[in-house]
Amino acid sequence: MLSEGYLSGLAYRNDIQWSYPSSNEQVAEEKEEEMEATAAASLSYSSVDETQVQNLYVSCKSSGKVISSVYSRESQHSRNPRITVLQTNPNPVYESPNLAAVELYRDTSRETYLVPPSCKSICKNYNDLQIAGGQVMAINSATTDFPSEGSFQYGPLLKSSEIPLSMEDSMFTQPSDLPPTPIQRYSSYWRITSIKEKNSLQMQKPISNAVLNEYLEQKLVELYKQYFMDTGFHDSSPTQILASELIMTNVDQISIQVSIEKNLEISKARDIVINRLLQYGSTEISTQSLHISQYSNVNP
């Protein structure tokens, strides 16, 4: 005679226990007891054959052991590479900084500046020339992204402690180190005025861009005055003498005169006068970046 039975429950493992497998024997025994109780409660009908119940229980028990063993192996295998990855790839935030950056940050009294390539020859040949403009890139402790020295493709790094001595100091201390340079007629005025005004410039530190530009413009005009005066008297030509006398006048007065004659603005007339001065064929000075040639390259 056939009888029907209903399966009110299935043997299963808890998801939390599956996600955290353990190799402890006590935990495994507790899981087995839980499976036995679940299977006994689910198959409580007397109409089901005892052999079928036993076979079902054995199959569930064996499948549970196989699944648990496979899962434990996979979990152990998956945990091992995570540990190695954490050991091989440390957090980049906690990496040790560059030694040069650390040394620079420790020594806050020494400033470091990025010198443009146009100033290489000037800093090398004229050690008494010191530029203190407001737009000079200073790298100090406030800099967050400190680049390496190899990334500076536009110029070298120049520290304030590496600036050599001034010209007069080096002449008194080490006169033999300076190479002998021929003294030109039109360079004496430039040398004398530069030495006289050097102390006045040092009194105004730090120099702003406006003061620096005004000083360079004044020195440029004075150099042109002396140059045209020397060449005019040397060639003994009336035109050169007249040209030198015109250059010796103030640039602002010439600009005002040109603006009155040509009905132009003073700023435009001033630009025309300066451009006209730059067209007089001097290979010694060129703009926009100021290049001063060496005395050995000047034709007497």
UniProtKB/Swiss-Prot annotation:
User: Residues where Phosphoserine occurs?
Assistant: 293
Q: Where in the cell is it found?
A: Lysosome membrane; Endosome membrane; Nucleus; Cytoplasm
Q: How is it modified after translation?
A: The phosphorylated pLxIS motif constitutes an IRF5-binding motif, leading to recruitment of the transcription factor IRF5 to induce type-I interferons and other cytokines.
* Hydrolase in keyword set: no
Q: What does this protein do?
A: Innate immune adapter that mediates the recruitment and activation of IRF5 downstream of endolysosomal toll-like receptors TLR7, TLR8 and TLR9. Following recruitment to endolysosome by SLC15A4 downstream of TLR7, TLR8 and TLR9, specifically recruits IRF5 transcription factor via its pLxIS motif, leading to IRF5 activation and subsequent expression of type I interferons. Plays a role in the regulation of endolysosomal pH in immune cells such as B-cells, dendritic cells and monocytes.
Q: Can you tell me where the transmembrane regions are?
A: none
- The answer to whether keyword Glycoprotein applies is no
Name of the protein this chain belongs to: TLR adapter interacting with SLC15A4 on the lysosome
Q: Which GO terms describe its biological process?
A: innate immune response; positive regulation of innate immune response; positive regulation of toll-like receptor 7 signaling pathway; positive regulation of toll-like receptor 8 signaling pathway; regulation of lysosomal lumen pH; regulation of toll-like receptor signaling pathway
Instruction: State any GO CC term.
Output: nucleus
The gene name reads TASL
Task: Alphabetically list the UniProt keywords.
Answer: Cytoplasm, Endosome, Immunity, Innate immunity, Lysosome, Membrane, Nucleus, Phosphoprotein
What positions carry the motif pLxIS motif?
289-293
Describe the subunit structure.
Answer: Interacts (via pLxIS motif) with IRF5; leading to IRF5 activation. Interacts with SLC15A4; leading to its recruitment to endolysosome.
Q: What is its main location?
A: membrane
Task: Give the domain section of the comments.
Answer: The pLxIS motif constitutes an IRF5-binding motif: following phosphorylation, the phosphorylated pLxIS motif of TASL recruits IRF5.
Which InterPro entries does UniProt cross-reference here?
TASL
